[in-house]
Amino acid sequence: MSLFSCAIKRYKEGNLILQICIGIVLGILIGIFSKDLAIFANIFGALFTGALKAIAPILVFILILTTICTKEFNHGSEKIKHIIFLYIFGTFLASLSAVSISFIFPVELVLTDIEKASTTSPAHIGEVFKTLLFQIVDNPIHALSSGNYLSILAWAIGGGFALRHCSNDAKQLFTDINEGVLKIVKFIVKLAPFGIFGLVANSVAQTGAAGLLSYIKLLIILVLTMFFVAFVINALIVFAYTKKNPYPLIFICLKHSAVFAFFTRSSAANIPVNMALCSKLNINNSLYSISIPLGATINMAGAAVTIAILSLAAAHTVGIEINFLQAMLLSVLAAFAACGASGVAGGSLLLIPLACSLFNIDYDIAMQVVAVGFIIGVIQDSVETALNSSTDVLFSAICSDNELNLKI
């Protein structure tokens, strides 16, 4: 095996988090000490962003269409229906919290060509809905090529419901296409260290410390919001449902589920850990055997927080004023989009343009925000997954008929 082949193999098998960290450090050093080299390195960043721009519309369309077309959500049990409601309601409250916190602590990012973006926001409800309706009825081919995510979303939902009763062979075809698109996405994300290296080098060379400080502030807001959801929103939901002190159960879920999910960065990979924890908690086996795998698919509070905060950061950066109606629409849209983000590498980040389209933010600007998300994703994605996965156990526990064992 040649030296080049060995290097590629070691890179493919390497730890992505460590590789991204190395890319960030090298990017900072290049940006500080060699502006010319940083400008050249930006080619990697531009290629990475371009690849994301190309695949994101196709991913959203295929992912949502396939999910609606193939998933069966009617499991019969009333308890399962309660858990599904809690998953969706909790995700919406997380999104609403993120929107509220973004208004209290607005974050502006250092982006390029922000003059491209729309800097006006419709003032009246009629104008908002008129804009939305005309975006929705766009030609689907044009929507995919131009990144009109509202139209993509509408056609994907319509197509998904229209195809729910198609043959199993047809559904399998869509599932296979979906898997193919996901493999392409995983390949692009595997190249993230090179793209992030170029983006960080160029950002440091062009803006100095200002760009990095805006990233750090954004990351702090994201992490604190997810902590707020874990310790306040989830606590209120548990208390409302059980009328008992929620924190002993919350701390058990965080200790035995969130810690593992933080390092695996995958809700699906954490399913065995969660099921073992449910068994220790004495939750009904017939309940958690369905609710835990289902939660790994649709319970995405952390993803909703990411989508909402980064979308509003884009709006604040380009100077768009968001009214109350648009804020509520964003909360709903972020929650809905988050439910389709499972199983996709960087899924919540790739759905940010969908939310940005609500504010007429230029597609290129939205993809720059996605790139920023990948830069801070080393921590953001880990905390997001920890919140998502631990909440699966939390909501399963409060819906269980059995006496919970909290002495573990």
UniProtKB/Swiss-Prot annotation:
Keywords from the UniProt entry: Amino-acid transport, Cell inner membrane, Cell membrane, Membrane, Symport, Transmembrane, Transmembrane helix, Transport
GO CC terms of this entry: plasma membrane
InterPro entries: Na-dicarboxylate_symporter, Na:dicarbo_symporter_sf, Ser_Thr_transp_SstT
Coiled-coil spans in chain: none
Its biological purpose: Involved in the import of serine and threonine into the cell, with the concomitant import of sodium (symport system).
Family: Belongs to the dicarboxylate/amino acid:cation symporter (DAACS) (TC 2.A.23) family.
Protein name: Serine/threonine transporter SstT
Gene behind the chain: sstT
